[in-house]
Amino acid sequence: MAGGVTGGAAGAWSDRFEQGLHPFVEAFNASIGFDLTLLQEDLDGSIAHARMLASCGVIAEEEAVQLVDGLELIRTEAADGRFNPGLEDEDVHFAVERRLIALVGSVGKKLHTGRSRNDQVGTDLRLWLRRRLDEIDGDLQRLQRALLDQADRHQSTMIPGYTHLQRAQPLCLAHHLLAYIEMLQRDRQRLGDVRGRVNICPLGAAALAGTPVPIDRRRTAEDLGFTAIYANSLDAVSDRDFCVEFSAAASLVMAHLSRLAEEVIAWASEEFGFVRLSDRCATGSSLMPQKKNPDVPELVRGKCGRVFGHLQGLLTMIKGLPLAYNKDFQEDKEALFDAYRTTRDCVEAMAILFEEGLEFRIDRLNQAVESDFSNATDVADYLVARGVPFREAYQLVGAVVRRCLEQDCLLRELSLEQWKEIHPAFEADLHEALAPRAVVSARRSEGGTGFDRVHEQVMLWQERLKESAVG
């Protein structure tokens, strides 16, 4: 068409449009500023597509070789910093196509045969996320190992256990740390589930309805390492469930990290004093010279909002979209990329913190477990073991605690005579049973905080994580 638009991304539809884009609209419409993140995946997908076209007789073998060589040259240029797309390219797909045509000539125009940017970007995103999921899994394993190393060192260390942030019962410190290892394992399992649904190939669905070109979708999917192809072309190009699923799984990772971070922040305070932060993982105040601030866990706690926000943004983006592809989908990438980066950074930060950034203060922990009423439940258990109904024992011990508070003393400071005045079932072995270490040891039920049970779990997790490393 005379006077048509030429050059850049607009060249792909130049015969339809007579005027160029308004400069602001061109910038507003472009995604090249962030979707260049998908360059390696775009090249991988295009190479597999070119080879498939040749295997199906759509293009000649020598043309496929030219295309693949050109795409690999673009990869080299990118690594050397010589591939520099501009705003006129609009997105990574047009940037690659433009450069490919410049390198190999008109044969480069055949690469897009049998596909659309709609199925192309869906493929790129899935390839990208599949790799990132594997990386995050490795990071989570690292954090698990850091926690496990601390747990191994503190199998005989005790810490107050809390409910409602009130001291409840003494625990083995290793047991407390193992709880977070369990949470992180569920996170790994969830991310693994996401990976299974990410690993389905949309390439070949074209714009929305498939293509009359005789392609082999399964060949391309296999070459790219996908386990299956989408059965419905409309679903293939419009599905962003996997972005939401990843953001949801990442949000749970962040929630768990935030819980751990909050405990470290509290433990590092003078009010608790359970941990001492390393200079390598803390900062000072610009005004108060005595301060050592827990910036790492505070930032982790704060960054939760970013990942949670991306989940809400993605859900809101897709909720009203008709089939099939809509430009709204351009908004999935920055949310997905940032959710990944933020989550991975926070996992690494917490791993470093537990590897070399904090030290548990055993003296303060011992002082804490020996200076409260967290052994009150064990007094009730003592009576129950001697035939007293639990509810009666519970009420008796509650009255004893009140009496101790009035007299400003602890349970273990009451004499045997005072205990016998409360109930004749109390004997001389009571004081031994109320010692914090005895209280912890008594929790022998499976999954409990008893030292022997905790040792079993430490050994089990050492074996599990060793197998994960090998796998």
Curated annotation (Swiss-Prot):
GO terms for cellular component: cytosol. Coiled coil: none annotated. It is found in: Cytoplasm. Its EC number is 4.3.2.1. It catalyses: 2-(N(omega)-L-arginino)succinate = fumarate + L-arginine. CDD domains: Argininosuccinate_lyase. It comes from the Bacteria. GO terms for molecular function: argininosuccinate lyase activity. GO terms for biological process: arginine biosynthetic process via ornithine; L-arginine biosynthetic process. The keyword Cytoplasm applies. Its main location: cytoplasm. Keywords: Amino-acid biosynthesis, Arginine biosynthesis, Cytoplasm, Lyase. Pathway: Amino-acid biosynthesis; L-arginine biosynthesis; L-arginine from L-ornithine and carbamoyl phosphate: step 3/3. Belongs to the lyase 1 family. Argininosuccinate lyase subfamily. This is Argininosuccinate lyase. It comes from Parasynechococcus marenigrum (strain WH8102). The gene is argH.
